[in-house]
Amino acid sequence: AHVERIATRPRPAGSAQHDLVRDGLVAALGALSLPVERQVTTVQQGTAAVRAARVENLMVRLKGTASTGAVLLAAHYDCVPAGPGAADDGSGVATLLEATRAIKAGPALSNDLIVLLTDAEEFGLLGAQAFVEQHPWAKDVRMVLDFEARGTSGPSQMFETSAGNGVVVSEWASLVPRPSGSSLTYEVYKRLPNDTDFSMFKKLGTAGLNFAFIGNWERYHTPRDSPGNLDRGSLQHEGDAAVVLARRFGAMDLGALQSRDAVYFSLPLVGVAPRYSTVLALPLAVGAAGLFVLAFVIARRRRETSIGGTVLAVIVYAVFVAAAGLLGWRSGRLAGLLHARWLPEGNVLMGGWYAATLVGAIATLWLALYALLRKKFNAHSIAFAALFVFVAGALATSWFVVGASFVLQWPLVGGVLAAMALRAGWEVPPGAGPLRAFIICLTAAPAALIVWPLVSLVFVAMGLAPESGAAIGVLTALGLGALSVQTEVIAQGRRWWPAVIAAIGTAACLAVAVTETGYSSRDPRLVNLLYVADADARTAQWTAQTIPRGVPQDRPRAGWPDPWLRQYLGDAPRTGRPDALVQPWSAATGTPGFLSADAPVVELPAPQASLVSSTPAEGGRTVTLRATPAGDGHVLSVWVNGARAIDVSIDGKRIAGQMPARAANDTAWSLDYVNAPASGTTITLTLVGVTPLTVAVVDRSAGLPEIPGRTFAPRPASVIPIQAGDQTVVRRSYVF
């Protein structure tokens, strides 16, 4: 019920719907007989390109009986303008409301519990930043549990932790039902530019865990992130984690949470999550390598392999792994060439079937290659060749990327044990053959439970974009190499049959993928339409992004303009952004990926800027401007150009940090202000030189204006907005 009330309509920060949802959350928390703390403040980040917002965070605090600090449960209650945000992050808010109710109904916790609903996460984590930097409760936090979503289904993944996570990971693995997550995602996330509110909380230097479910990621930040599409099992899994972990950390000494990082991974078919200290990673890798050497020496003494044959096979297998990664890198592009029906980040429609085709193609190549190699090498040489790559990878990851070491270590152990069980010619006592075959199949468990689920996870998380395609290709090749002994068992002398069967399956997957006839309500096209008005020139344009973000600009664009867009753009739209959208430092109006056409001019309120003062300063002047939004716009932008700013204050708050060192002719400065006061904002800039200052003020509001005398067909279900959604943009320029 919480999700249905929260996610009826989009609620971006600063919107009327956002305020309605906020008031409803205050009432829901108040119904628990808890006093609600409201943090209303302004916050800003950046120097040359500043983001700012008026935010209103909501929080409650349950006092502990013998507190050693506070446990913080966090989720954000705003969402993007394009969709209602049932999963992102209505699910997190609902989780916290129910967890608070359950915990309050039970025995009192020893530690304090803070429940924080942040504002303006989608605009740059500004609500979380305001809490961390400005609220007095922040200094009490010792443990953070953050709940997010990047899809509408799937298990709640624990995808990020704080440093020194051994204790908190152990509690997660032992308490949460069907734990899902691994230290691999922790290592990957540390190297990505992605952020959630948890990124701000980590600045507190506290322990923490970050959760999100990611299934059906294509619904993320679109109208399809709706209550009807939200998997209740995902919501329940998130809620289970919140309650058990809040209770556990609420009873622990929060001063004793720091420890060495852990290597951890979940086994999805088993429902457990093994974990051990990173200190053990290198000794385990060395031990696995030693087991490999022992097995190889035994095989050599039995004349079951040779050094020369194994070296040649190592080269062949390493080339195969690299080729599989390259094929995966190009797979999304190749699929796009077949029908050019693109999704963001280089993904394509029917991506699941194309991913299955990719895996099948790599499997077919490996099985065919295996059959060819068996004409020259015996099974042991091929197995040890693949395992040698695992040895090198296990040692390297255990030293450089410790959290990823389990991906290669445990399949290596299983592969070595399988190779030791394999005997040339299968000359064994009667009755021993089936037992050995069973043992060999059992040793496939590490690869089956670790490597192959990662192939699926990568696709679910990132689709078939180039980077994820490459990862899928490499993981598939590694998974096949780890099972080379099992391949020998399955083939049983019929070496070409596995390749033939894999080829048939691959062809079937490709046939299903290419039958996609077009965008539909099940697989919609993602298009944002903007009405862009230049208040100075009294002109207006329609503009639409025609190639999704991350898609190669030289790829074909099937069916453009879309039939629905033709009523706005006509049959011969221009390429590029309208002038009113071009910032002083951005590319020219020929920017690819956009289509534009003239639009009827509608009388719309325009944002305003005025010069409050201009006084001499050493080497230049100090200018104070007043920028005022047009009305109830979502974002007020101020773009300044013409003189380099060396010091800036917004509403009396000096921007923290040094202005970046830039080229002398780089004079651009910008502010994007979410939920700006209707009375306006004051900007003071200390400038180098006294050259005229060009100032553009831009007001962005959700939705499109009514056009007198024109009626447009509504969006079909096969064409939907994403992220910022449809917008009305009004720009006015000044020279001061």
Predicted regions and their residues:
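Alpha-helical transmembrane segments of integral membrane proteins
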Residues: G287-S586
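General structural signal for secondary-structure boundaries
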Residues: A1-V3, A105, P136-W137, A273-L280, ...
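A generic short-segment signal for beta-strand/edge and adjacent turn/coil regions
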Residues: A82-A86, D112-L116, P177-G181, R495-V500, ...
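Juxtamembrane/start-of-transmembrane alpha-helix segments at the extracytoplasmic/lumenal side
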Residues: L267-V286, G346-A355
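Intrinsically disordered, low-complexity boundary segments flanking structured domains
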Residues: F131-Q134, A251-L254, E516-T517, D598, ...
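Extracytosolic and intramembrane catalytic regions of membrane-associated proteins
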Residues: D23-A49, A53-R61, V93-A94, S174, ...
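C-terminal domain-closing interface element
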Residues: K139-M158, A281-R302
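Soluble extramembrane regions of membrane proteins in the secretory/endomembrane system
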Residues: A1-P274, S637-G642, D647-S649, K653-G689
